[in-house]
């Protein structure tokens, strides 16, 4: 009980931290980052890594750029995303015009670390959505985080394929429920078949058993 209480307290402090910089990052980004903190909770780290991987693959971020540093710099900015015509222009501004305060970055509290991670992840997700041309449901990011997609070989290709396959709200919701093992038998079978199709496209030479294992392994809560 004490552990989960401390986690909840840290998340609440991080949300307060996000709210305190709303004048820098803007209301829309502050709302998105706060929602991400509330929904993602312990999966925020993996989701941030996944967003970073696909962000670099799509040239939203440059190689070796980190979502946490992006978020920290956004918190120091005097312009918000609303001041720019596109997310890519906003990211370019943060990249080129805002200097990272390394002293502040290295001595941040746990709440500040969570806040900047959530902000940087949200910015990157918006950039990915801009590149892809559609909004990506939060359930998709949450499911990918639970599945540990950030740990895979060739992960950017896998992540992109999953985003494409589960880009509608209903399919994303079903995927997240599948990962948690909370679907009825009929819907679970349908999602499993869809996952198998994705994995077969990614690995056309893989055996039936290997594909089935990936489908089963995706169900971390089953």
Q: Model-derived features: where do they sit?
A:
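Alpha-helical oligomerization segments
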Residues: 2-10, 17, 197-222
């Amino acid at each position: 009980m004490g552990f989960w209480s401390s986690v909840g307290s840290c998340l609440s402090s991080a949300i307060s931290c996000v709210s305190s910089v709303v004048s820098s990052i803007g209301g829309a980004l502050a709302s998105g980052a706060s929602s991400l903190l509330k929904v993602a909770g312990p999966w925020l780290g993996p989701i941030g890594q996944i967003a970073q991987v696909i962000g670099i693959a799509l040239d939203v971020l440059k190689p070796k750029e980190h979502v946490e540093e992006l978020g920290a710099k956004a918190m120091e900015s005097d312009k918000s995303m609303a001041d720019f015509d596109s997310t890519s222009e906003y990211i370019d501004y943060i990249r080129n015009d805002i200097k990272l305060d390394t002293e502040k970055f290295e001595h941040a509290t746990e709440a500040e670390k969570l806040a900047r991670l959530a902000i940087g992840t949200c910015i990157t997700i918006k950039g990915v959505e801009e590149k892809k041309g559609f909004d990506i449901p939060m359930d998709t990011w949450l499911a990918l985080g639970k599945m540990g997609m950030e740990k895979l070989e060739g992960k950017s290709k896998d992540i992109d394929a999953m985003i494409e396959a589960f880009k509608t709200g209903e399919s994303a919701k079903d995927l997240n429920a599948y990962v948690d093992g909370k679907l009825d038998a009929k819907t679970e079978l349908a999602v499993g078949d869809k996952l198998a199709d994705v994995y077969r496209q990614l690995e056309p030479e893989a055996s039936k058993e290997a594909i089935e294992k990936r489908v089963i392994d995706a169900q971390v809560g089953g």
